[in-house]
Amino acid sequence: MNNEWLNAYVLHRRPYRETSYIVDFFSLEEGRISAVAKGVKNSKSDKKSLLQPFQHLRLQLSGKSDLKNLRHVESVAPSISLTGTALFCAMYVNELTNRIMPQGLASDGVYSAYEAALLALRDEADIEVTLRQLEFALLDEMGLLPDFTSDVEYEMPIEENGRYHFQLDAGFIQIPDDVVGARGIPGTALLSLSQGEFTPLSKKVAKVLCRDLLKPLIGDKPLKSRELFMTKPR
């Protein structure tokens, strides 16, 4: 890794000793990786100014342990400008990626979805769709994204007019037609999600599903970005 240049974004940084930072990066080539940026905390160096979220960087690291040393860093593109709700959502994107992606697991799919989410937030795209697409990419990488096309109990295709129960550790199970008053998830919403289509109905379904599926990955520790968003002035 000593001579390899990595494409990366800063997910989080925190003070380390008196003059340094520990920086969590998300890279295309090596996945999530942490490194010490030595002597930059109280400096006015370019290196310190670059170690900010939402900026595409190239960096070189050294070291054999899980905690690397940052040797070189340079900008690939200007920082992605975000304000208001988009900024809070981007903070959520960073925190969620940092919380879920295992150290050292490279994923082209998640990296592409992560970068696309930041650019979509900058461009004021539909926030619900932007966040769900990233969450789906993370769940898919972790092997937890359900099959939106098949009933796991009967091994039959999802029916557009059917209604389904979601079982967290299995998938979607059709509710029999003779069950009175059962609401369930409309098959039409599942089929939309299987095609990557976010209709008003499928967006609502996706939000609930992601909340339930992400909970075991996030754990009991609350996401700070969520707390900040809830307390921001309206």
Swiss-Prot record:
Gene Ontology biological process terms, A to Z: DNA recombination; double-strand break repair
Kindly list any coiled-coil regions of this protein: none
For this protein, the record's InterPro entries field holds: ARFGAP/RecO (IPR037278), DNA_rep/recomb_RecO_N (IPR022572), NA-bd_OB-fold (IPR012340), RecO (IPR003717), RecO_C (IPR042242)
Keyword DNA damage recorded: yes
Question: GO CC: one term?
Answer: bacterial nucleoid
Q: Does the keyword Secreted apply?
A: no
- What does the UniProt keyword field contain? DNA damage, DNA recombination, DNA repair
Name the family the entry cites. Belongs to the RecO family.
- Provide the function of this protein: Involved in DNA repair and RecF pathway recombination.
Under NCBIfam families, the record lists: reco
Q: What is this protein called?
A: DNA repair protein RecO
Native species: Alteromonas mediterranea (strain DSM 17117 / CIP 110805 / LMG 28347 / Deep ecotype)
Q: By which gene is this protein encoded? A: recO
